[in-house]
UniProtKB/Swiss-Prot annotation:
GO molecular function, one term: structural constituent of ribosome
Superkingdom field: Bacteria
Keyword Glycoprotein: no
GO annotation, cellular component aspect: cytosolic large ribosomal subunit
Biological process annotations from GO: translation
Listed name of the protein: Large ribosomal subunit protein bL35
InterPro entries, A to Z: Ribosomal_bL35 (IPR001706), Ribosomal_bL35-like (IPR021137), Ribosomal_bL35_CS (IPR018265), Ribosomal_bL35_sf (IPR037229)
Lineage of origin: Bacteria, Pseudomonadati, Pseudomonadota, Gammaproteobacteria, Vibrionales
Amino acid sequence: MPKMKSNKGASKRFKKTAGGIKFKHATKRHILTKRTTKNKRQLRPNSLLAKCEVAAVLRMLPYA
């Protein structure tokens, strides 16, 4: 049986850890002058994926 392919977009965005699946928030690259300080601060930490979305991401990453 051939190897399963990982979804390349998902493999670049998500990382499996012992506590769950880690991801980085979007809209933090450029043109940040429009955003408030509070908004930028809230987007700062890496977050864990919600439980309802974990199964879908793990299907995209068969070897995670």
